[in-house]
Amino acid sequence: MHFTQREQDKLMLVIAADLARRRQQRGLKLNYPEAVAIISFELLEGARDGKTVAELMSYGKQILGEDDVMEGVADMLTEMEIEATFPDGTKLITVHHPIV
């Protein structure tokens, strides 16, 4: 089985998000890469589930809160952009201040 670079990147994101969720379930606060992985994964899955870009921009702010991340992470993550595949093509999802 051969994967394109984009497919490999998506698989790595799934693995990173899974590891971050496991750490979160153990009561650990998430660091910057873990928070980005979880939010990115949830946005990509939302697109796959048929949500609109507008719905995902709003949903992106509900995935994690300041209590879920280490001190300073919310301040560092002021904007996220991720390209997702929708039924009508690939679109950019931008979430401003994803951790509130």
From Swiss-Prot:
Pfam family, one: Urease_gamma
GO BP annotation list: urea catabolic process
Top-rank taxon: Bacteria
Pathway noted in the entry: Nitrogen metabolism; urea degradation; CO(2) and NH(3) from urea (urease route): step 1/1
Disulfide bonds: none
Keywords recorded for this protein, A-Z: Cytoplasm, Hydrolase
InterPro entries linked to this entry: Urease_gamma, Urease_gamma/gamma-beta_su, Urease_gamma_sf, Urease_subunit
Uppermost EC category: hydrolase
GO molecular function: nickel cation binding; urease activity
Enzyme Commission designation: 3.5.1.5
CDD domains membership: Urease_gamma
GO cellular component, one term: cytoplasm
Subcellular localization: Cytoplasm
Keyword Hydrolase applies: yes
Catalyzed reactions: urea + 2 H2O + H(+) = hydrogencarbonate + 2 NH4(+)
Assembly and interaction partners: Heterotrimer of UreA (gamma), UreB (beta) and UreC (alpha) subunits. Three heterotrimers associate to form the active enzyme.
Family: Belongs to the urease gamma subunit family.
Annotated protein name in UniProt: Urease subunit gamma
Taxonomic lineage: Bacteria, Bacillati, Bacillota, Bacilli, Bacillales
